[in-house]
Structures are given as structure tokens and as C-alpha cells.
Amino acid sequence: MAAILHLIYTLTHLGLMFWGLHLFPQSSNIATILLLVVLTGLIYDNLIISLGSLIGEGEVLEFLNKLRFLFHALFTPLLLVIAVELANYAGVEWFANPIVRLITWLITIGLIEFEFRKKYLKLKLESTTFAGTLRYREAESNSLPMAAILTIVLVAVIGIIIWQTLQCPWVFVGALIMFFGSAVPTRLVGPVLGSGVEIVLLLSFLAIEYQM
């Protein structure tokens, strides 16, 4: 059942990517480009989870799953830049300031570097099954994903500012849903819920672009 859900998630992200490509000629901003990058990572993430049982346990699946963690480390902090660029595109004057945008990039690069050095380079994987899926997860996961948490909190704050400017709460709501959905332990629901709420956040980003 979970494998089917992740396949549906894969197709949904693919649909969002086509929507983003459709919106790009109208917007031509960096937010759309980065959204497409993040969507590429999520398509890969869900596809590998959905196909894990077919590929089978072993070095190949472990390597493919290690790439999942790499993409999460590299791409998740980009959500912060996307939110800031959307706020700028929406006409929030404060985010048009080059210094603010530079600081945003520096924070994002710092979060990527932190996640890559502290988590990915020390990553040890173990195989696990859930509801018919086979994937590799962190063998030792005693710390919170601080980079992802900080990213989503900052996106939620920016979402509030966009809400006040455009009278549209979608980014804030999407970030809030992702925050609480991702907080549910994977030992209870596997990655199904966390992958689902990622769709909500990215859909909220595209909805804002469409509205503008």
C-alpha cells in the first residue's frame, strides 16, 4: 500500500514540475528554477522508495537511498530562498533589498554545509521495511534535523509576511502542515506522511506564483 502511495506522490510531483515549467515563461524568476530543482529531488526520493522492494536489499539500493539523503541535504534549505524570492516577487519591499537576499543565500549555504558535514558525511544506513516498502534509513538518528526545522520555521515566518501582503495564506499554511506532518515519527507511519506534506508546501509555492 505504501509503495503505491509513494508512486502516486512521484506522479504528483511530476505534475507539479510540469506546472512549474508552464509558469516559468510568465515568471522567469529564480524561485521557479529552484522549485524545479527541489521537485526533481522529491521525484527521485519517492520513486526510489516505491521501487525499493522490486530492486531488493543490497548495495545498489543502499547507494540509491544514500543519494536520497544527499538530495535532502542539498535541496531542503533551498526552500528558504524560494520563499524569499516569492516574497520579493509578490512585492514585499523588505525582501527586495539585496542585502536581505544575500543574507538569505548565506544562511541557506550555511544550512546545506551543516547538513552535509554533520549528517551526510557521517551517514550510516540500515535497511527497513514499512507497509510493503523497502528502503534504507539512518542507523543512528539521535539528533533532530535542525537544518530542516529551521528552514521550515523561517519559511512559515515569510509565509505570514506574504499573507499580509497578498491576503493569501497558502505558504504559511503549507509550511505549518509540513512542520507538524514531518514531526510525526517515521517509526509510526514510515515516510508516507512526511512525503505527503512536502507536496502541500510545494503546491502552496506554485499557487502563489500562479496567483501573481
Predicted regions and their residues:
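Hydrophobic transmembrane alpha-helical segments in integral membrane proteins
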Residues: 1-16
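Juxtamembrane "helix-exit" motif on the non-cytosolic side of transmembrane helices
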Residues: 22-25, 49-58, 116-124, 182-189
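Membrane-interfacial loop-to-transmembrane alpha-helix junctions, especially the N-terminal start
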Residues: 28-39, 98-102, 165-175
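C-terminal transmembrane-bundle signature of multipass membrane proteins
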Residues: 76, 151-212
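Membrane-proximal helix-loop-helix units in multi-pass membrane proteins
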Residues: 84-152
